[in-house]
């Protein structure tokens, strides 16, 4: 396939924190929340929207609690500022609307649930609010927030070995469900996920897999079974992520909406000229995201 597609980028918004009594292990900044900008004609336009939303968000958070610390552009929300993460999502939705991008930008969340999962009783503690949750309660909670807020991507919504509940959510949520801890860029785990219908997207961390040829084998396998592949820059690949994301025709990419990585994507878009295609909402998995794409096309 010719490399000509530019993926949907995101921009960092909020880093997790021990807001509600914390997880079972140290959350390490999870869940993280980003905004994905998909309703645009070019990567450059999407990147501008990422910058615009992030700037407004930083100002809003500054007004809310002054001098917010941040981890790699993710703003760390201190304890006691919000009663639950639903208040954060309301503020994020407000920011998107104020910037004029309603229906063209949505949420990506890396839940990294393993941090909050107690293997003894199977419950999740300190995730989103201070209520412990069984996997079924967490599943219902996700369906509720997907109805209430513009979520387009959830990553690792359940613990890394819960393929069955992940599969149910993949089917019922209608959005992009990404496996990171679920798959660890490992072809055997991806193959097992495929048999279960768990997730519809594999997070790609090149450093996790050993060799580039192993990574390519995993990518081809995922594509063969209709899964998407979402490159992640979480391990400091730098600007090279843009070259290989376009090289594999990825539909979406973790963050990369602002800064040097975004600049490299825009250079590639300019080099490709008229052949460059920004995938937009079509680059996102899930029937709800395809409905978003339909709605945007009707508006054109």
Stretch-by-stretch model annotation:
Residues 67-69, 82-299:
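Catalytic core of soluble alpha/beta enzymes
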Residues 1, 299-300:
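Accessible peptide chain termini
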Residues 1-77:
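Mobile "lid/hinge" segments at catalytic clefts and subdomain interfaces of large enzymes
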């Amino acid at each position: 396939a010719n490399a000509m597609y530019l993926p949907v980028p995101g921009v960092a918004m909020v880093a997790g924190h021990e807001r509600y009594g914390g997880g079972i292990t140290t959350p390490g900044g999870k869940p993280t929340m980003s905004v994905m900008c998909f309703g645009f004609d070019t990567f450059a336009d999407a990147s501008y929207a990422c910058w615009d939303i992030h700037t407004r968000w930083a100002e809003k958070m500054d007004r809310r609690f002054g001098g917010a610390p941040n981890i790699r552009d993710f703003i760390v929300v201190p304890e006691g500022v919000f009663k639950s993460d639903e208040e954060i999502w309301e503020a994020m939705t407000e920011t998107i609307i104020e910037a004029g991008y309603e229906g063209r930008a949505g949420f990506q969340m890396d839940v990294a649930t393993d941090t909050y999962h107690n293997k003894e009783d199977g419950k999740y503690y300190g995730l989103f609010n201070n209520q412990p949750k069984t996997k079924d309660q967490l599943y219902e909670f996700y369906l509720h927030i997907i109805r209430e807020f513009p979520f387009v991507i959830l990553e690792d919504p359940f613990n890394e070995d819960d393929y069955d509940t992940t599969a149910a959510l993949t089917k019922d949520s209608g959005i992009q469900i990404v496996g990171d801890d679920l798959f660890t860029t490992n072809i055997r785990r991806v193959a097992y996920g495929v048999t279960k219908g768990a997730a519809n997207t594999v997070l790609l961390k090149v450093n996790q897999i050993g060799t580039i040829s192993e990574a390519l084998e995993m990518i081809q396998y995922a594509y063969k079974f209709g899964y998407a592949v979402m490159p992640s820059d979480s391990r400091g690949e730098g600007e090279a992520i843009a070259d290989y994301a376009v090289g594999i025709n990825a539909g979406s990419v973790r963050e990369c909406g602002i800064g040097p990585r975004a600049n490299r994507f825009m250079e590639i878009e300019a080099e490709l000229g008229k052949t460059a295609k920004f995938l937009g909402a079509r680059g996102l998995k899930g029937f709800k995201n395809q409905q978003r794409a339909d709605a945007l096309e009707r508006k054109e």
